[in-house]
């Protein structure tokens, strides 16, 4: 069996051979006028009219020799067989194909379509040309590859060879399009805000730090677009959203990637309940669009609502309002759950919630979180230790976080100052003091509801895949030692 290097050397010789024949192995233009799906869908009409087609794609298989060759060509839309016959294209063209074309090469073919005796839809070729001569062969075996990280590193091969992978990413593209469609129909406007920020904020997370040489200034990659979007509410926009690439310098697992897409949405004059109602409609809309591709079937509405502290008490017996910090620490130690000693009672309660979150399978709202976990949310009028906030949990995962936005500038400054003290004590996820945002808030911001949806996580939940890595084209993986 030839080694990879031998195969590459042989293909380089073929490139040189093509050039000696006056053939460019990497031409710019093609006469392509159909994609493969067009041909398969309109096959009967094309046959009846004896229509000549021109398609371009990658050679996926070749069989036969001599006077007849069968092969398959694949483009973004599908795969179809093509037939080369010596009496159709001549000996010179047959020799050219046999001697210079390999699996993985891109080719343009022209001809008419017909159906073989076995019923396979086929293009009878009367002309062809090389579009790209590949140096490396496409692997013949891809399914069952044990090294998942290698599969991700070479996602391009995964897309070429695994129909299910391609299908998942096609659905991802559709889902983001449908989300925008849903929001546009409600008169939301899509906006863009800075990724490089002098003060990070909008979430409790550790940021990535970078440096702007031109101004000798340290900057952060945004962890969320929230504070800039709220500035737009202050500026007069009432219904806005952003599909924001965000970055968090935290753990990597099946639910987290250091960079991710977060849909953040703000709706002036809307309450938390109105926001939850809209979110329900969005989930139902996406589920209906997916039809049989969704794992959820008919989702029942309205989604159940569970109060955060009631959920904790039901699962552990702990009372988030009255039990001491020591009691929470004892529970975590007894159950071998790691925690940081400086963590507050509210943070420990949130840690406990995450331990039991996996038990919530059907779409469910968890509401009324502790104030300390929510420095940007409005307090409940009748319970100032809790806020008008919600999580949407689906299949044990948090896919959305939303709340009624705090618009009291003095209260916001006080909370930022409290968070800043926590940051100085070593809490890397505490919110920094952002006086520029406080100044903006002092000009007045309308009451508003806001939410953030982890798009990667939502898509993985709707499609029933186990990890967000399966819905990210290029999730973060360790660098291959061979390439270091």
Question: Locations of the language-model features?
Answer:
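Extended, domain-scale alpha-helical bundle/helix-rich regions
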Residues: 2-7, 54, 271, 320
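Flexible loop/turn segments at secondary-structure boundaries
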Residues: 198-202, 229, 248-251, 372-376, ...
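Active-site pocket scaffolds in enzymes
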Residues: 409-484
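Well-ordered alpha/beta subsegment
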Residues: 95, 101-102, 115, 265-291, ...
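Metal-assisted phosphate- and nucleotidyl-transfer catalytic regions
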Residues: 201, 205-207, 285-399, 418-445, ...
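Class II aminoacyl-tRNA synthetase-like tRNA-binding/catalytic domains
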Residues: 15-21, 25-274, 336, 460
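Nucleic-acid-binding small beta-barrel platforms of the OB/S1 family
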Residues: 1-20
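Conserved phosphate/anionic-ligand binding catalytic regions in large, soluble enzymes, centered on
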Residues: 58, 234, 392-405, 445-463
């Amino acid at each position: 069996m030839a080694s990879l290097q031998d195969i590459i050397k042989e293909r380089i010789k073929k490139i040189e051979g093509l050039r000696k024949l006056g053939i460019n192995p990497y031409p710019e233009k093609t006469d392509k006028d159909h994609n493969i799906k067009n041909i398969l869908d309109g096959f009967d009409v094309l046959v009846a009219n004896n229509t000549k087609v021109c398609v371009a794609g990658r050679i996926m298989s070749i069989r036969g020799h001599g006077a007849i060759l069968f092969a398959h060509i694949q483009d973004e839309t599908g795969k179809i067989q093509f037939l080369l016959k010596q009496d159709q294209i001549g000996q010179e063209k047959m020799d050219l194909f046999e001697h210079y074309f390999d699996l993985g090469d891109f080719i343009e073919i022209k001809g008419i379509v017909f159906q073989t005796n076995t019923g396979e839809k086929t293009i009878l070729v009367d002309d062809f040309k090389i579009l790209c001569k590949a140096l490396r062969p496409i692997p013949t075996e891809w399914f069952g590859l044990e090294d998942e990280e290698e599969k991700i590193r070479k996602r391009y091969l995964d897309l070429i060879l695994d129909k299910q992978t391609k299908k998942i990413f096609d659905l991802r593209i559709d889902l983001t399009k449908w989300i925008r469609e849903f929001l546009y129909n409600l008169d939301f406007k899509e906006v863009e805000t800075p990724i490089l920020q002098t003060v990070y904020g909008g979430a409790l997370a550790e940021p990535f730090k970078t440096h702007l040489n031109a101004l000798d200034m340290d900057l952060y990659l945004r962890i969320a677009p929230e504070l800039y979007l709220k500035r737009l509410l202050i500026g007069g926009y009432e219904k806005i959203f952003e599909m924001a690439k965000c970055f968090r310098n935290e753990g990597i697992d099946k639910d987290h990637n250091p960079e991710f897409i977060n849909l953040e949405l703000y709706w002036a004059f809307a309450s938390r309940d109105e926001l939850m109602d809209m979110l329900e409609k969005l989930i139902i809309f996406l589920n209906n669009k997916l039809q049989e591709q969704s794992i959820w079937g008919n989702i029942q509405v309205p989604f159940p609502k569970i109060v955060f502290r009631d959920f904790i008490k039901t699962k552990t017996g702990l009372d988030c309002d009255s039990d001491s910090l020591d009691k929470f620490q004892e529970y975590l130690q007894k159950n071998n759950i790691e925690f940081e000693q400086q963590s507050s009672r509210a943070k420990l309660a949130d840690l406990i919630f995450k331990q039991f979150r996996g038990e919530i399978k059907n779409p469910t709202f968890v509401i009324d979180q502790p104030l300390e976990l929510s420095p940007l949310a409005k307090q409940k009028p009748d319970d100032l230790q809790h806020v008008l906030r919600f999580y949407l949990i689906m299949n044990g995962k948090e896919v959305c976080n939303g709340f009624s936005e705090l618009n009291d500038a003095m209260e916001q400054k006080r909370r930022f100052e409290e968070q800043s003290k926590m940051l100085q004590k070593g809490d890397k996820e505490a919110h920094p003091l952002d006086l520029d945002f406080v100044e903006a808030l002092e000009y007045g911001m309308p009451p508003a509801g806001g939410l953030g949806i982890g798009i990667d996580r939502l898509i993985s939940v709707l499609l029933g895949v186990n990890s967000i890595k399966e819905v990210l084209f290029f999730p973060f993986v360790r660098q291959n030692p061979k390439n270091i």
